[in-house]
């Protein structure tokens, strides 16, 4: 298991991050190379220092595993304040992977660039901040936002308009026909109320 050695046994939440290790943006070739070299050296040091008889089998990934790099500045930005908040222009319903009862309606505006006409971004490249970005970056939300962006782009072509001007109810109907949940319903909300899940 690579995560046993990765970054000095760093966790998903940044615990055990190696002391004095800088943050990496992952936005330049030099930065990615520096990240890879330092990470491999950290892993090799960990292997050298450990008892060889107590090691797990390990595989070293062939790609950098950077979580946060660049993302768009959207027409809307998903934040933690949006948990359990209905969004009129929602294109999918996602949940927090750490707290599956915490639901977010993802507005189309989070996928639409504020600065570049007809540019859509999904998953970790969509517009979100803070912990809401962590919720949006994982694979299931990336799939759902990708499906929504594809449907929005196709509809914009059909309607001969900018993607930010598509008919939202029509887009939602298209996505619902593809079995995408768009809005929260009472049966999806926690029985003990939303307060304990925020």
At which residue positions do the language-model features occur?
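Flavin (FAD/FMN)-binding glycine-rich loop and adjacent Rossmann-like elements that form
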Residues: 1-198
């Amino acid at each position: 298991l690579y995560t046993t050695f990765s970054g000095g046994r760093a966790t998903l939440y940044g615990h055990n991050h190696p002391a004095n290790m800088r943050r990496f943006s992952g936005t330049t070739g030099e930065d990615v190379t520096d990240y890879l070299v330092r990470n491999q050296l950290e892993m090799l040091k960990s292997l050298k220092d450990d008892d060889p008889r107590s090691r797990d089998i390990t595989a070293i990934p062939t790609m950098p595993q950077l979580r946060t790099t660049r993302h768009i500045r959207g027409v809307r930005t998903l934040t933690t304040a949006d948990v359990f908040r209905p969004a009129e222009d929602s294109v999918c319903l996602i949940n927090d992977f750490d707290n599956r009862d915490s639901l977010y309606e993802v507005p189309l505006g989070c996928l639409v660039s504020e600065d570049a006409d007809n540019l859509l971004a999904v998953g970790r490249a969509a517009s979100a901040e803070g912990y809401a970005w962590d919720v949006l970056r994982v694979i299931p939300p990336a799939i759902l936002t990708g499906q929504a962006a594809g449907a929005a782009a196709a509809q914009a072509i059909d309607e001969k308009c900018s993607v930010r001007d598509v008919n939202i109810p029509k887009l939602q109907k298209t996505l619902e026909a593809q079995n995408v949940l768009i809005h929260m319903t009472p049966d999806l909300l926690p029985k003990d109320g939303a307060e304990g899940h925020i």
